[in-house]
Design a protein with these regions (language model features):
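Membrane-proximal basic amphipathic "stem/tether" segments
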Residues: 1-5, 133-213
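Metal-dependent nucleotidyltransferase catalytic core
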Residues: 14-17, 58-97
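Active-site nucleotide-donor binding segment shared across nucleotidyl transfer reactions
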Residues: 22-55, 59-65, 224, 251-252
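Cytochrome P450 catalytic domain signature, combining two hallmark sequence patches
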Residues: 74-79, 254-262
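Residue-level detector of conserved catalytic or cofactor/ligand-binding positions
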Residues: 272-279
Length: 279
């Protein structure tokens, strides 16, 4: 399904989810900052980038862990926190605040039925030495790749293709093992990621990084950039960005005020089913 066909309704829904997340965090004294394209949207467009299709936030690890605990005990009404700890089909190691009155399947290869969502990325303390922080990112990425591999559902035909060539027998064996032992392997990988995420004391750390982010080494940056945050108008509400947002955004994107070429202004999610109306 093409998001452009339902863009107005889509944006209204994810904006409502963002407002719900804000209310939850204000009620419990938690902090988050808009990040990536959402942060650019706040500065450059004062709202969702016209061709963007999601909202992303980062949350300091201590607050993120508290949010996970709060979600176990508190009813968020029509919203739910989707995490890798309570949904075996969920293939990611960050969380989403999801609207239960909506439905989507984000990927065909790793299908997980949830509602429309806001992505919540944990922001972890990391090594003060940048090179060591980068090596930690590399190690973490390898674990994520393994989690992705065991979460991918292959069709029968794809399995047979692997079996018919001696060059792919090894991959067939790994896929078969993953099929029968997926839950155990998944739990082990998540424990490894949990361990790495808590290696350093967040309060004492000089640098932080989003291990689950997709911008490579750029995900490592000085914690002092966050500060107390800076408020920006965002559609019909306001959002918080890192206090030194200009340094933060230039670190990730260079001249972020420059519009990308027209051919790059496209939605990025691979969606196979969408239902955004309340039943």
């Amino acid at each position: 399904m093409d998001i452009k066909d339902i863009k107005k309704e889509w944006n209204a829904k994810i904006l409502d989810i963002l407002k719900a997340l804000t209310r939850i965090c204000e009620d419990h004294g938690l902090t988050f900052y808009c990040c990536a394209g959402t942060a650019i949207g706040a500065v450059r467009h004062h709202g969702i980038i016209p061709w963007d299709d999601d909202i992303d936030v980062i949350m300091p690890r201590p607050d993120y862990d508290r949010l996970l605990e709060i979600a176990k005990k508190e009813d968020f009404g029509k919203y739910e926190l989707v995490t890798p700890y309570d949904n075996e089909a969920y293939p990611l190691y960050f969380s989403k605040l999801s609207d239960k009155t909506t439905t989507l399947v984000e990927e065909r290869e790793r299908p997980c039925v949830i509602g429309l969502f806001v992505d919540i990325f944990p922001l972890d303390a990391t090594d003060d030495d940048i090179d060591k922080a980068h090596r930690l990112k590399d190690r973490y990425t390898k674990i994520i790749n393994r989690l992705n591999a065991i979460s991918t559902r292959n069709t029968f035909g794809e399995y047979m293709q692997l079996l018919t060539s001696t060059k792919t027998w090894g991959r067939f064996a790994i896929k078969t093992l993953a099929f029968f032992c997926r839950s155990a392997i998944r739990r082990r990988l998540i424990r490894q990621m949990d361990g790495m995420s808590h290696l350093y004391d967040y309060e004492k750390a000089k640098n932080v990084q989003v291990y689950t982010g997709s911008y490579g080494y750029r995900e490592v940056f000085p914690k002092e950039w966050l500060g107390k945050g800076k408020t920006f108008p965002f559609e019909d509400t306001t959002v918080l960005l890192p206090e030194r947002y200009d340094e933060y955004l230039r670190h990730f994107f260079g001249d972020y005020m420059q519009l990308p070429p027209v051919e790059q202004r496209i939605e990025k999610h691979n969606l196979s089913l969408i239902h955004i109306s309340e039943p």
